[in-house]
C-alpha cells in the first residue's frame, strides 16, 4: 500500500515449525553455531531481565551482535531468514529491530507479532509439548500489553 513496504509476519504455526527444527545447544558460547547450523535465526527483543523464558532456538541476547556480524560477513548471510519476536503484539521494539535488520541489508526478516504473551497463552491452553519454552513461566501477565484505555483515561484526567 502506498510508498511503504509491508512487514512480513509469521504466525504461531510458523513458530511451531521453527521450534521443531530447534536442537538442544551445548557449550556454544560466542560461536557461529546459530549462523551455520540453521536455515533461520530467531531473535527476541525482550529486556535483559526477561531472558529466562524464551521460545526454543532463540539466539542468546549476548550472542546477537556476533551472529549478525557473521551473517553480514558471509556470502549468503543476508538472505538467511530472521524471525523477530518480543513481549506482545504492542511491543514496538520488534518493529525497531525489524527496521534495523532491513537497514543492514537483510532480505528475509519476519516478525512474530503475538510475541511471548501469545505463545505463553497458547502454552497454557494446549500444553508445553505444542508450545515449548526454555523454562516454565508462571506469571503470564508480565508479558501482556499495556491497556490503551487506561492511558487514554490518564490523558483525559490531566
Task: Please give the residue ranges for each predicted region.
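Rhodanese-like catalytic fold shared by cysteine-dependent sulfurtransferases
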Residues: 1-30, 35-40, 45-158
Amino acid at each position: 500500500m502506498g510508498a511503504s513496504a509491508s512487514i512480513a509476519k509469521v504466525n504461531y504455526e510458523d513458530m511451531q515449525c521453527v521450534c521443531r527444527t530447534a536442537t538442544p545447544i551445548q557449550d556454544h558460547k560466542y560461536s557461529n553455531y546459530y549462523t551455520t547450523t540453521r536455515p533461520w535465526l530467531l531473535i527476541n527483543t525482550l529486556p535483559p531481565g526477561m531472558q529466562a523464558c524464551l521460545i526454543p532456538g532463540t539466539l542468546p541476547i549476548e550472542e546477537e551482535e556476533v551472529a549478525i556480524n557473521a551473517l553480514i560477513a558471509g556470502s549468503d548471510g543476508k538472505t538467511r531468514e530472521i524471525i523477530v519476536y518480543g513481549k506482545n503484539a504492542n511491543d514496538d521494539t520488534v518493529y525497531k529491530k525489524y527496521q534495523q535488520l532491513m537497514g543492514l541489508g537483510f532480505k528475509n526478516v519476519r516478525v512474530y507479532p503475538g510475541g511471548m504473551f501469545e505463545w505463553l497463552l497458547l502454552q497454557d491452553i494446549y500444553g508445553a509439548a505444542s508450545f515449548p519454552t526454555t523454562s516454565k513461566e508462571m506469571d503470564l501477565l508480565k508479558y501482556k500489553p499495556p491497556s490503551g484505555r487506561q492511558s487514554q483515561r490518564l490523558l483525559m484526567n490531566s
